[in-house]
């Protein structure tokens, strides 16, 4: 009889943060909105707050970067550690150290689903269907997968059953799709800059931006728009039709997450051949089931916000059963190891975090060491062949641990 590997138990869980409202601006890391000045991601981009003049020029003006990065580390009895990052900052540290720790410490490193279910159940009364608490749970879940992979000596994608393709191809999100094309990406997604409060003039301006990029990128390069919850159904429908002559591939997250009926109406009225996508700010499997029922074409969960890798795998299975695609919101290595195992994820997102989109910078820089970037718009599965998620924590980032237990 062959010996079965004895797995260690989890001895410690620890939580740090960097950046956020209590730190110097521009820390980056898991909260990739926390950038310095003159960065495209904090330019005049349409948001739900754009209707207020005091908050229309910059997303940081209304506090998009106040949370900062949460770092969760889990340590096994044998001294091996796993970690992950997300957007939850100091408040996430409190939740981990003062509440979730009881469900983690003392469990076997393979008890990921048990821990996940207990975290969801224990926070249900104050978590709702997403947000800060779900970000924190996601971060813990990812750290557990990282630890499990390191203990057994396998990359996370092999723990999920292995790759279904040799490489991942990417589109780039940023202000310069023309530069993304030169770098080998299959498409470029731009933020919109105007919203319903700008009326038809706003529609004309964003449509002109798409037209300009279509001329620069040629007829076949994918172009998409990210609307970041800033529109209503009528405005989004008019914008979609205004952009249809320029072969817009999809229009993304036009409405707030809870407006399921609005997404159903938008999908029904969108131009033929143009896809409607959303999901970045949805959390929990149940919310994605409701979103799937609207008939949108692509669901876009963020693995660091939706409940972690455990939930992302469930969302992908749900979408597959309905013939829908899952293309996660860009989350670097945490997405790479998942999507290379999904048959309904033919491409993925890479978020351009360099200020002017002219260079490739790792998304969670500087908090992750050895973080991958695409080469000619692609990442081959062979570069994922390191235990866990294949990255290490940069402990020179002035990590702060405000709580302990």
From Swiss-Prot:
It is an enzyme of class 4 (lyase). Substrate binds at residues 33, 59, 349. Its EC number is 4.2.1.90. One of its GO terms (biological process) is amino acid catabolic process. The keyword Metal-binding applies. GO terms for molecular function: L-rhamnonate dehydratase activity; magnesium ion binding. The record marks 302 as: Increases basicity of active site His. The record marks 349 as: Transition state stabilizer. The keyword Magnesium applies. Binds 1 Mg(2+) ion per subunit. InterPro entries: Enolase-like_C_sf, Enolase-like_N, Enolase_C-like, L-Rhamnon_dehydrat, Mandel_Rmase/mucon_lact_enz_CS, Mandelate_racemase_C, Mandelate_racemase_N_dom, RHMD-like. Keywords: Lyase, Magnesium, Metal-binding. The active site is at residue 329. SUPFAM superfamilies: Enolase C-terminal domain-like, Enolase N-terminal domain-like. It comes from the Bacteria. Pfam families: MR_MLE_C (PF13378), MR_MLE_N (PF02746). Its cofactor is Mg(2+). PROSITE patterns: MR_MLE_1. Mg(2+) binds at residues 226, 252, 280. It catalyses: L-rhamnonate = 2-dehydro-3-deoxy-L-rhamnonate + H2O. Reaction proceeds via a syn dehydration. Belongs to the mandelate racemase/muconate lactonizing enzyme family. RhamD subfamily. Homooctamer; tetramer of dimers. Catalyzes the dehydration of L-rhamnonate to 2-keto-3-deoxy-L-rhamnonate (KDR). This is L-rhamnonate dehydratase. It comes from Salmonella paratyphi C (strain RKS4594). The lineage of its organism: Bacteria, Pseudomonadati, Pseudomonadota, Gammaproteobacteria, Enterobacterales.
């Amino acid at each position: 009889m062959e010996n079965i590997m004895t797995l260690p138990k989890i001895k410690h869980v620890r939580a740090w943060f960097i950046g956020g409202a209590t730190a110097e601006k521009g820390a980056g890391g898991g909260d990739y909105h926390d950038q310095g000045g003159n960065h495209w991601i904090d330019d005049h981009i349409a948001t739900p707050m754009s209707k207020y003049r005091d908050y229309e020029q910059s997303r940081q003006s209304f506090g998009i970067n106040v949370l900062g990065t949460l770092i969760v580390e889990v340590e096994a009895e044998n001294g091996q550690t796993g970690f992950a990052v997300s957007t939850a900052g100091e408040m996430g540290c409190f939740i981990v150290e003062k509440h979730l720790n009881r469900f983690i410490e003392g469990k076997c490193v393979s008890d990921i689903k048990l821990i996940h279910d207990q975290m969801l159940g224990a926070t249900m009364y104050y978590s709702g269907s997403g947000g800060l608490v779900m970000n924190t749970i996601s971060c813990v879940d990812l750290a557990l997968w990282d630890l499990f992979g390191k203990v057994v000596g396998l990359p996370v994608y092999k723990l999920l059953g292995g790759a279904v393709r040799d490489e991942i191809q990417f589109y780039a999100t940023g202000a310069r799709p023309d530069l993304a094309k030169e770098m080998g990406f299959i498409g470029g997604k731009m933020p919109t800059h105007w919203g319903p409060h700008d009326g038809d003039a706003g529609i004309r301006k964003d449509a002109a931006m798409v037209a300009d990029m279509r001329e620069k990128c040629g007829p076949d390069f994918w172009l998409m728009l990210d609307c970041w919850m800033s529109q209503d159904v009528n405005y989004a429908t008019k914008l979609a039709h205004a952009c249809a002559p320029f072969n817009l591939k999809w229009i993304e997250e036009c409405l707030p997450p809870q407006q399921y009926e609005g997404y159903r109406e938008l999908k029904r009225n969108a131009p033929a051949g143009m896809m409607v996508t959303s999901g970045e700010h949805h959390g929990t499997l149940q919310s994605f089931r409701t979103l799937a029922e609207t008939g949108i074409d692509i669901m876009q969960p963020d693995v660091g916000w939706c409940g972690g890798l455990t939930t992302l795998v469930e969302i992908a299975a749900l979408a597959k059963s309905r013939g829908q695609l899952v293309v996660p919101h860009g989350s670097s290595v945490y997405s790479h190891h998942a999507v290379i195992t999904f048959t309904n994820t033919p491409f993925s997102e890479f978020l351009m975090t360099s200020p002017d989109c002219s260079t490739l910078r790792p998304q969670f820089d500087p908090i992750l060491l050895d973080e991958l970037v695409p080469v000619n718009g692609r990442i081959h599965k062979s570069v994922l062949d390191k235990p866990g998620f294949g990255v290490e924590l940069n402990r020179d980032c002035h990590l702060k641990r405000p709580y302990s237990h």
